[in-house]
Amino acid sequence: MHRRRRDNLMTPAEMVASMKPPQSLSTEDDDGSRRDSESSADVLKSNEEFQARMIPEDDDANSVTAQPTWTVLSDTEIKSVLVVASFAAAISPFSTSTYYPAVFAISQDLGVSVSKINLTMSSYQIFQGVAPTITAAFADTYGRRPMFLVCFAIYFVANVGLALQNNFTTLLVLRCLQSTGSSGTFALAQAVTADITTRAERGRYLIYATLGSTLGPFLGPVIGGLLVKFLGWRSVFWFLLCMGTVFALLIFIFFGETARPIVGDGSVPPQSWNRSFLQIRSKGITSLKPNLASLERRKSRPNPLTSLALLWDRENFILSVSGGLLYAGYSSVTSVLASQLQQRYKYDAVQVGLCYLPVGFGSLLAYRTTVRLMDWNFEREAKKQGLVIVKNQQTDITRFDLEKARLGFVFPMILVCSVLLVAYGWQMHYHAPLAPILVTMFLIAIILTGVMNAIAALLTDVNRENAAAVGAAMNLTRLLLGAGAVAVVGPLNKSAGIGWTATVTAGLWVLMMPTLRMVYRDGFVWRAGENERVHASNVELAALVRS
């Protein structure tokens, strides 16, 4: 099992005194085999006793260990950095959503079926999952800013080629290249959020960190529909090229490095080649004294396998697959909506684009509703467990049941979303009026955005030192599952109908819930046991060195 390094770990003595799990938990013999001598009821009781020892008593609630300030950036500066990063990440969802209204026109112009054009969406999602693992590895070593600029350079080349190509094979290859450039920016934006925000405050900053990626599904189909109708489908790629140029200029001029191994809390100047245009103009002059103690360990060389290694951890794996299944179901809805509206309702590209607006409105509204619920539940659990939250100070999670704080509200939301997805499928199947279909899509977007953000926040929280890598790992699982869903949904719709397709998807969501609940119930114990094993290994290593 992959061993993750946790921040703010306790000393070995404290680990032995307060973290050692009772013998009733599953232990290992010398030969590595697992033993479990008690009944399941006894094990559950022991787990509860273990958690009770790990969570501070109420008497200690007011004793706060002094923590350093997490970032020197002001609240306004944090929001500005997150907005710039989120707009840079917007090229990924824009490249997906502006393409939807063009599918029918491209298939007619190139003389291929819509199913073949759907393969370009599946291949796009596959590369959207794989490419960030490489981007994240280099970003954790060399910084976020240079990798943003590299991603944009690849993106520019792909869009020029897509606007000029004339056959399906070239379209397929260049869509993969376009995905390689655009998808890395999404993982980088997630890493920037982890660099400059604390766990307790992350929810309230999510609206800024995800503004660009939310506007993609919101505005992309409308813009794509207008472009296809009045200028032709090639204009979609020229538009993406121009938009990418604007966002790249924002990074080049305004965006400063945020990776903590390079700039720490923001007070340490980055390398001269890794400064924004504004920093170069000011010649690096700052009134801040560099806080070298805030620098984190820097990886000596990029390792693209880090993202895959993180998935070897059972908590990471369950969370990533759960988020992936939710995303796959969501993708299966949005990817076929365009063709369904054109075939069943005889809508043109502009009308199809307008029908995507409720999805965007729902996603945007989620950051004013369900994401605030995430912060509220975090504060409630912290108070319940006797943890004091201090503004701009990182929360120590070694004695905090973070899983209950993040996942406490997601299970009823998944059930409601499953019911809504079934309703959407059968409404489309029976050619229901468009109004209830759009309302259903709006509600799905609100609820599902909140659930996926809660899962993503938990993954980032427990892997903060590998923020870019865990973002890439999450993208890898969800986009590979999403690509599979998009590839399967077309044939499944033809054979069984969209009603049964939606019903099967909702059933998978419900079947996923018991596994996700294992993380909610036992994730804290898993992390505590892993921390103890890491410390035990460190003690053994130190003893060998001394001898």
From Swiss-Prot:
Gene3D superfamilies: MFS general substrate transporter like domains. Glycans are attached at residues 118, 167, 274, 493. The chain crosses the membrane at residues 81-101, 146-166, 206-226, 236-256, 317-337, 347-367, 407-427, 432-452, 469-489, 496-516. MFS-type transporter; part of the gene cluster that mediates the biosynthesis of squalestatin S1 (SQS1, also known as zaragozic acid A), a heavily oxidized fungal polyketide that offers potent cholesterol lowering activity by targeting squalene synthase (SS). The gene is M6. This is MFS-type transporter M6. Residues 1-45 are annotated as: Disordered. It is found in: Membrane. One of its GO terms (cellular component) is plasma membrane.
